[in-house]
Amino acid sequence: MTAATAAEMTGTLPPPYFSDRILACLKEPGGADDTGLVLEEGALRGTNSGRVYPFADGTIPALFLDQKGDGEGVTTAIKRFYEEYPFPSYEGLEDFGQLVQKGSKNPFSAQLLKAIGYNKTVLECGCGTGQLSHYLQLNNNHVLGIDMSLSSLGLAIQHKLRNGLGRSCFAQMNIFNLAIKDNSFDVVISHGVLHHTFDARRAFAQIVRKAKPGGIVMVGLYNYYARVPTYLRSKVIGLTGGKLDYVVRNRIHDARKADVWIKDQYYNPHETWHSIDEVLGWFEENGIEYLNTSPAILGTDGETTAGLFARTSPGTAFQRVVTQLGWLGTIAREGALFDVIGRKKEPS
């Protein structure tokens, strides 16, 4: 769906591909932070070089630089996988009202929107088909969702244009070479993505550069302990069918979306598992102050705090291990994703 088609369908002017606040955060692919981009008909143009970056398929802003050398094979395999299985996909022809209703009923997304607040710039690294990016543009937030899958981004932009959403913006980028200026976003999120890169630690170091000093960084990963049941199910799900999966049985009502979930969870060509302590090490390396973990670390004030971005104790190593073993009975049935939240330290 093009902007013109959307305008014909709705009888209104199409929303811009990028809001002014998001466009100001972009730079040329591989360029320095003093480069910028301007929006033209069906393309972006570099303000310094004059180079034109045409939209892929006429609708998707394409700022992707191929990965050469380290990790090229993994990047290519994952890109190919998500072109075939855009994730998480939509349940039929969802409108924005339905998406907001679902997001508001989901404890995680509702808490996240509340914690972000109002009038923020938000970067979602690995946005997939864009549901979270669309939801977070509520409260007058301006959101940029980036992904390398054109199939996923196509669905995200189709939803944007069909529903006239001007503050959720999308572009194809490589997470290891982002066409985004450093220190430009209030909140940087990567929820369930870095474990599909060839080096999650290096990918994390790239995305935190895009957060402003004092800004929020949130990373969601497969847990080293809680992912084990998914691995075991993967050995038999081809025989038993998708109903073995808790999410398919209880959450998904669309056959295509259920198939995409099964493929993502059990047939993904590359994934890595991680622990809270590993992420705490990444925080230390990249100047990130620890704030919170979701689900909360047992025996800490994280269990009682009202805000997802509130400063809490990381607990002891023993508490963190016990917490993650406990996740075998909770988040293990839903993909085993945990999130660690921090704040980028101000320069000393």
Language model features with spans:
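A short glycine-rich, Lys/Arg-flanked "PGG" loop and its adjoining helix->strand segment in the class I
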Residues: R201-P213
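Conserved SAM-binding loop of SAM-dependent methyltransferases across substrates and taxa
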Residues: T129-N140
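Rossmann-like AdoMet/SAM-dependent catalytic core
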Residues: R256-K345
